[in-house]
Amino acid sequence: MRVKLCGAAGGRLGTLAGLGRSGAAALALPGCLLYTRTGTAPHLTLDTLREVSGVPPVAQLTLPAMAELHDVLAEYKEGAAKFIGMPDTVLYCSLQDPVAPCPSGYNTNKTVSLWSSSGRMEMTASKFMDIQRAIQPDWFQCIADGDTISGEVTRKRAKKSVDRSLSFLDACLQLLEKTPELQGSVMFGTIEGGDVLEERLRSARETAKRPVGGFLLDGFQGRAMAKETKMNLISSVTAELPEDKPRIIHGVGKPDEVLECIERGVDIFESFFPFQVTERGCALVFGYDYLSDPKAEAALKQNGAQDLEKNSPEEDQEEEVVKADPEMTPFEIFLKEKRYHDDFRPLLEGCTCYCCQRHTRAYLHHLLVSSELLAGVLLMMHNFQHYFSFFSAIRDALRDDKLDQLKKLIFRQALQGPENAKIDQ
């Protein structure tokens, strides 16, 4: 596995080549992973997933879900990729599920707590590596003490998280050498330290001294950390890392945050954000065509997530019994709203996804208010494809030296919604 960079300004444009046991797969950078739940894309079968364009070659498994299958996979002996029916997919196993809450205060010097549907599991380095031996992933995040995202982490606690994580890393590296089933697997070192710059830098420098295949920037999930602090820490950490190894970040998915992290040297992101949007009954409609094309500008206005045509105050608002999720972002539309019941446009004008080519907003509104399972399937197909296409647009913008233009477009939509964002001439 090796990073080949093209030297574009504003981000690390290139390719992560030599992936998988065969070494034939490659991931374009900056890029994202395919988010899965127990090895399956949410709401989708393998057949419906094949209808989605731009699916990344690397799928993300989460350890809490896979740990429950440990005994089954250990008996199966052929690894999770073949077990889930995706033998040609490169698998990355992360320590936590980015969507699931992770209670604080349960890690110790010897164990890290995972939270699954069956409750809390305590994970030692030895038990962790036993599970990885059964999963046989191509990449996996090393066990680490990432309990530093509450916003109230002291310098002492940040230091402890780094010390514990380095201790876990050394133990797992020793076990990796003695595990023949994982000789083709790559371990990613986890960089911790909360919001304490000195500890973040120490974690990055010490982790970079170990024989890891890449780096995982952890602890930047959620809103506990101020945005300016978060971005300054990411810049400082990536400056300490070798150029020839990939950098993954967990818990960052919104388009504006993704662009800021890319500018600061991050390579790979998760794709949990489209899943969260789908679970809210929403569709991604933000524009990412940064070229000065009048047709693109017109389509962007037409696809506005914050339509000015809101229900007027005179209308009976009691009919609007379903309220939007408070976590909803300006990049999406809430299709349960009554105004979509007779909106016969596709979710996104110009979108080539399976859903937009065949169905309308009105039909999705009907499926959602009727609690039909098909709603999740169609929304997931659209949201995944739109999100994957966004990363393709980022790479094009880097290649064309237009990242600033794309960033302006995305940031205007973050503030105003797609309808009111204008594309600079």
UniProtKB/Swiss-Prot annotation:
InterPro entries: QTRTD1, Queuine_tRNA-ribosyltrfase, TGT-like_sf, tRNA_ribo_trans-like
GO cellular component: cytoplasm; mitochondrial outer membrane; mitochondrion
Topology relative to the membrane: Peripheral membrane protein
Cofactor names: Zn(2+)
Similarity-based family: Belongs to the queuine tRNA-ribosyltransferase family. QTRT2 subfamily.
Record-listed Zn(2+) binding positions: 351, 353, 356, 382
Pfam family, one: TGT
Taxon lineage: Eukaryota, Metazoa, Chordata, Craniata, Vertebrata
Region (Disordered): 302-323
BP-aspect Gene Ontology terms: tRNA-guanine transglycosylation
UniProt KW Membrane keyword: yes
Location (main, coarse): cytoplasm
Designated name of the protein: Queuine tRNA-ribosyltransferase accessory subunit 2
Coiled-coil parts of chain: none
Gene Ontology molecular function, alphabetical: metal ion binding; protein heterodimerization activity; protein homodimerization activity; tRNA binding; tRNA-guanosine(34) queuine transglycosylase activity
Protein location: Cytoplasm; Mitochondrion outer membrane
Keywords from the named record: Cytoplasm, Membrane, Metal-binding, Mitochondrion, Mitochondrion outer membrane, tRNA processing, Zinc
Function text: Non-catalytic subunit of the queuine tRNA-ribosyltransferase (TGT) that catalyzes the base-exchange of a guanine (G) residue with queuine (Q) at position 34 (anticodon wobble position) in tRNAs with GU(N) anticodons (tRNA-Asp, -Asn, -His and -Tyr), resulting in the hypermodified nucleoside queuosine (7-(((4,5-cis-dihydroxy-2-cyclopenten-1-yl)amino)methyl)-7-deazaguanosine).
Organism of origin: Gallus gallus
Manner of cofactor binding, per the entry note: Binds 1 zinc ion per subunit.
Name of the gene: QTRT2
